[in-house]
Amino acid sequence: MSDDAGASFSGGDTDVRELPSATSARRQRTTDQWFQWAAFTRDGKLATSYYDRQYGDDERTGWSDFSLSGSRGLRHFGVTRVTSSSMPPPTQFAGGFFGDYTGLAADRVAYPAWSDTRTPAPVLCPGTGTPGHPPRLCVTPAPNAPYNNDQEIYVAAVRVPSG
């Protein structure tokens, strides 16, 4: 903890980037991961799911992905990207609220669940939906993303990596 704007920290002098991580993947040691869940498979593998900014330029743009890390012996961790492409920041709430609606279940494989923001949230196009002008839907830009979007719950069945 720091009480002098980061000039010093209590709790030891180890650089936090050198502390154990849920994965030993090179890019994940220096990027953001958050809202994690953990579960064990039937055969004893640890699975950990979380939002992740290690892909592309997510750390700079604020976009994110969902990842799954796994280990059998807790010494070496593997990581799998669960999302097929990065998600823009959420746009529904002022201030960029990102719902913490995540979860993880496991049996033979892992079932991570997350709030996905890749689906645009269309609105009624201006000047439509009136007499003589049939309604049309438009996708509009957002202040913090290329388009307004919805947070939808996604679930995937994913083999747990071993590392």
Identify what each model region corresponds to.
Residues M1-G163:
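Extracellular, repeat-based ectodomains that mediate carbohydrate processing or recognition
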